[in-house]
Structures are given as C-alpha cells and as structure tokens.
Curated annotation (Swiss-Prot):
It comes from Brucella melitensis biotype 2 (strain ATCC 23457). The keyword Zinc-finger does not apply. This is Large ribosomal subunit protein uL23. The lineage of its organism: Bacteria, Pseudomonadati, Pseudomonadota, Alphaproteobacteria, Hyphomicrobiales. Part of the 50S ribosomal subunit. Contacts protein L29, and trigger factor when it is bound to the ribosome. Keywords: Ribonucleoprotein, Ribosomal protein, RNA-binding, rRNA-binding.
Amino acid sequence: MTDLRHYDVIVSPVITEKSTMVSEHNQVVFNVARKATKPEIKAAVEALFGVKVTAVNTAVCKGKVKRFRGLVGRQSDVKKAIVTLAEGQSIDVSTGL
C-alpha cells in the first residue's frame, strides 16, 4: 500500500528543455517539498513509480524579486530533485501518477 506522505514529498515533475536533456542520462527532475530530505525523496519515487533509484541530487532555486505597482514582492523558493534511475528503468512524467 502506498503511504500518503509520499504524495506530499513530490510536488510535480519539471518539464523543461534542460530536464528533457537529462532524461537521456536516466535522470528525472521533480519539484519537491522544501523540507524533504534525500532519503525521503528516494523512498517516495521508488514507492510511487516502482523503479530503483541510484542517486538523488537536490537544489534550492531562490525565488525572483518582482515589483507590482511600486510594491516589492518575492516569489517562493522551489526545491528541485534530480533523481538518477537504475540502468534500464525509466519514468514517463507526461502521464499522471
């Protein structure tokens, strides 16, 4: 049975030109919760997608400073996880969970 906390760890897949380029190297990019750790991300991907994860790299992308009608605001920070899968395994992120 899938633990419901796994759905809180992985927020969404990242579908950009750069993330599709790394998919050639058996890697997938996800937006994850800010407080998620690498072991939690690994467990969530393995449980939700049924694949073997060999490595997890994370990066916190700082939000941009935006101005609207003279007021300064800031976009939220986003944590990205680059998940490396075992040889011969893949995840189709264009379909849902």
